[in-house]
Amino acid sequence: MEQNDLGLIEKIVYLNRVAKVVKGGRRFSFSALVVVGDGKGQVGFGLGKANEVPEAIRKASEKARKEMISVPLLDGTLPYEVLGRYGAGRVMLKPASKGTGIIAGGPVRAVLEVVGVHDILTKAIGTNNPHNVLRATIAGLASLRSADEVGQLRGKKVVTPRK
Protein backbone atom coordinates (compact mmCIF):
# COMPACT_ATOMS: atom_id res chain seq x y z
CA MET A 1 0.00 0.00 0.00
CA GLU A 2 1.51 3.29 -1.04
CA GLN A 3 0.33 6.87 -0.89
CA ASN A 4 1.04 9.24 -3.77
CA ASP A 5 1.22 13.05 -3.98
CA LEU A 6 -2.56 13.52 -4.44
CA GLY A 7 -3.30 11.77 -1.14
CA LEU A 8 -4.59 8.69 -2.95
CA ILE A 9 -3.84 5.22 -1.60
CA GLU A 10 -2.74 2.72 -4.25
CA LYS A 11 -2.81 -1.06 -3.85
CA ILE A 12 -1.75 -3.77 -6.27
CA VAL A 13 -4.39 -6.50 -6.10
CA TYR A 14 -3.03 -8.95 -8.65
CA LEU A 15 -0.06 -9.32 -10.99
CA ASN A 16 -0.18 -11.85 -13.81
CA ARG A 17 2.49 -13.05 -16.23
CA VAL A 18 1.33 -14.48 -19.54
CA ALA A 19 3.51 -16.10 -22.21
CA LYS A 20 3.15 -16.03 -25.97
CA VAL A 21 5.11 -18.85 -27.57
CA VAL A 22 6.96 -17.69 -30.69
CA LYS A 23 9.62 -19.27 -32.92
CA GLY A 24 12.47 -17.96 -30.76
CA GLY A 25 10.96 -19.03 -27.42
CA ARG A 26 8.48 -17.39 -25.08
CA ARG A 27 7.47 -13.73 -25.03
CA PHE A 28 6.33 -12.64 -21.58
CA SER A 29 3.76 -9.94 -20.91
CA PHE A 30 2.36 -8.68 -17.62
CA SER A 31 -1.03 -7.50 -16.42
CA ALA A 32 -1.66 -5.62 -13.19
CA LEU A 33 -4.91 -5.05 -11.31
CA VAL A 34 -4.73 -1.93 -9.11
CA VAL A 35 -7.20 -0.20 -6.77
CA VAL A 36 -6.92 3.47 -5.86
CA GLY A 37 -8.82 5.33 -3.14
CA ASP A 38 -8.65 8.37 -0.88
CA GLY A 39 -9.66 6.61 2.35
CA LYS A 40 -12.75 8.86 2.58
CA GLY A 41 -15.24 7.16 0.27
CA GLN A 42 -13.65 7.44 -3.18
CA VAL A 43 -12.44 4.30 -5.00
CA GLY A 44 -11.47 3.19 -8.49
CA PHE A 45 -9.78 0.22 -10.15
CA GLY A 46 -7.77 -0.32 -13.30
CA LEU A 47 -6.28 -3.16 -15.34
CA GLY A 48 -2.99 -2.39 -17.08
CA LYS A 49 -1.09 -4.57 -19.53
CA ALA A 50 2.50 -4.13 -20.70
CA ASN A 51 5.76 -5.94 -21.43
CA GLU A 52 7.26 -4.73 -18.13
CA VAL A 53 5.75 -4.89 -14.62
CA PRO A 54 6.24 -1.19 -13.64
CA GLU A 55 4.63 -0.04 -16.90
CA ALA A 56 1.61 -2.34 -16.35
CA ILE A 57 1.20 -0.97 -12.80
CA ARG A 58 1.47 2.64 -14.04
CA LYS A 59 -1.19 2.05 -16.74
CA ALA A 60 -3.50 0.33 -14.24
CA SER A 61 -3.25 3.14 -11.67
CA GLU A 62 -3.90 5.78 -14.37
CA LYS A 63 -7.08 3.95 -15.41
CA ALA A 64 -8.09 3.59 -11.75
CA ARG A 65 -7.77 7.35 -11.16
CA LYS A 66 -9.95 8.10 -14.21
CA GLU A 67 -12.80 5.81 -13.14
CA MET A 68 -13.31 6.65 -9.46
CA ILE A 69 -16.71 6.27 -7.79
CA SER A 70 -18.05 7.75 -4.57
CA VAL A 71 -19.24 5.46 -1.76
CA PRO A 72 -21.45 6.68 1.13
CA LEU A 73 -19.84 5.62 4.42
CA LEU A 74 -21.42 5.67 7.88
CA ASP A 75 -19.09 5.66 10.92
CA GLY A 76 -16.35 3.66 9.19
CA THR A 77 -18.73 1.04 7.76
CA LEU A 78 -21.51 0.78 5.15
CA PRO A 79 -25.03 2.15 5.72
CA TYR A 80 -26.68 -1.23 4.94
CA GLU A 81 -26.01 -4.76 3.63
CA VAL A 82 -25.46 -5.11 -0.12
CA LEU A 83 -24.69 -7.87 -2.63
CA GLY A 84 -22.41 -7.08 -5.58
CA ARG A 85 -22.51 -9.21 -8.73
CA TYR A 86 -20.16 -9.52 -11.68
CA GLY A 87 -19.87 -12.60 -13.90
CA ALA A 88 -19.91 -15.67 -11.66
CA GLY A 89 -18.69 -13.57 -8.73
CA ARG A 90 -20.95 -12.52 -5.87
CA VAL A 91 -19.69 -10.47 -2.95
CA MET A 92 -21.77 -9.91 0.18
CA LEU A 93 -20.87 -6.74 2.10
CA LYS A 94 -22.40 -6.47 5.57
CA PRO A 95 -21.95 -3.52 7.97
CA ALA A 96 -20.34 -4.34 11.32
CA SER A 97 -20.10 -2.69 14.73
CA LYS A 98 -17.07 -0.66 15.79
CA GLY A 99 -13.98 -2.72 16.60
CA THR A 100 -14.84 -5.61 14.28
CA GLY A 101 -12.22 -4.76 11.67
CA ILE A 102 -12.22 -5.73 8.01
CA ILE A 103 -13.23 -9.37 7.76
CA ALA A 104 -12.41 -9.91 4.09
CA GLY A 105 -9.89 -11.62 1.89
CA GLY A 106 -7.82 -10.75 -1.16
CA PRO A 107 -9.31 -8.24 -3.62
CA VAL A 108 -12.27 -7.38 -1.36
CA ARG A 109 -9.95 -6.36 1.50
CA ALA A 110 -7.83 -4.20 -0.82
CA VAL A 111 -10.88 -2.29 -2.09
CA LEU A 112 -12.33 -1.75 1.40
CA GLU A 113 -9.00 -0.54 2.83
CA VAL A 114 -8.51 2.12 0.13
CA VAL A 115 -12.16 3.27 0.27
CA GLY A 116 -11.87 3.96 4.01
CA VAL A 117 -14.02 1.23 5.58
CA HIS A 118 -12.79 0.07 9.02
CA ASP A 119 -15.49 -2.36 10.21
CA ILE A 120 -17.21 -4.79 7.82
CA LEU A 121 -18.09 -8.46 7.29
CA THR A 122 -17.78 -9.87 3.76
CA LYS A 123 -18.11 -13.11 1.85
CA ALA A 124 -17.01 -13.78 -1.74
CA ILE A 125 -19.15 -16.46 -3.39
CA GLY A 126 -19.03 -18.24 -6.76
CA THR A 127 -15.50 -17.51 -7.98
CA ASN A 128 -12.03 -16.81 -6.71
CA ASN A 129 -10.91 -15.01 -9.87
CA PRO A 130 -9.46 -11.71 -8.52
CA HIS A 131 -10.78 -9.65 -11.45
CA ASN A 132 -14.39 -10.83 -11.08
CA VAL A 133 -14.32 -10.60 -7.26
CA LEU A 134 -12.93 -7.04 -7.45
CA ARG A 135 -15.55 -5.95 -10.00
CA ALA A 136 -18.36 -7.53 -7.94
CA THR A 137 -17.12 -5.60 -4.87
CA ILE A 138 -17.02 -2.32 -6.82
CA ALA A 139 -20.51 -3.04 -8.24
CA GLY A 140 -21.84 -3.58 -4.71
CA LEU A 141 -20.27 -0.36 -3.43
CA ALA A 142 -21.54 1.57 -6.48
CA SER A 143 -25.11 0.43 -5.77
CA LEU A 144 -25.07 1.99 -2.28
CA ARG A 145 -27.21 5.11 -1.76
CA SER A 146 -26.99 7.62 1.08
CA ALA A 147 -30.05 8.48 3.18
CA ASP A 148 -30.30 11.87 1.43
CA GLU A 149 -30.30 10.26 -2.04
CA VAL A 150 -33.02 7.77 -1.05
CA GLY A 151 -35.09 10.58 0.49
CA GLN A 152 -34.81 12.64 -2.68
CA LEU A 153 -35.82 9.68 -4.87
CA ARG A 154 -38.87 9.01 -2.70
CA GLY A 155 -39.76 12.67 -2.29
CA LYS A 156 -39.44 12.46 1.48
CA LYS A 157 -37.61 14.61 4.00
CA VAL A 158 -34.73 12.86 5.80
CA VAL A 159 -34.84 13.16 9.58
CA THR A 160 -31.84 12.02 11.62
CA PRO A 161 -32.77 10.49 14.98
CA ARG A 162 -31.48 12.18 18.15
CA LYS A 163 -29.10 10.16 20.30
From Swiss-Prot:
One of its GO terms (molecular function) is structural constituent of ribosome. One of its GO terms (biological process) is translation. Coiled coil: none annotated. It comes from the Bacteria. Belongs to the universal ribosomal protein uS5 family. With S4 and S12 plays an important role in translational accuracy. HAMAP family: Ribosomal_uS5_B. Part of the 30S ribosomal subunit. Contacts proteins S4 and S8. NCBIfam families: rpsE_bact (TIGR01021). This is Small ribosomal subunit protein uS5.
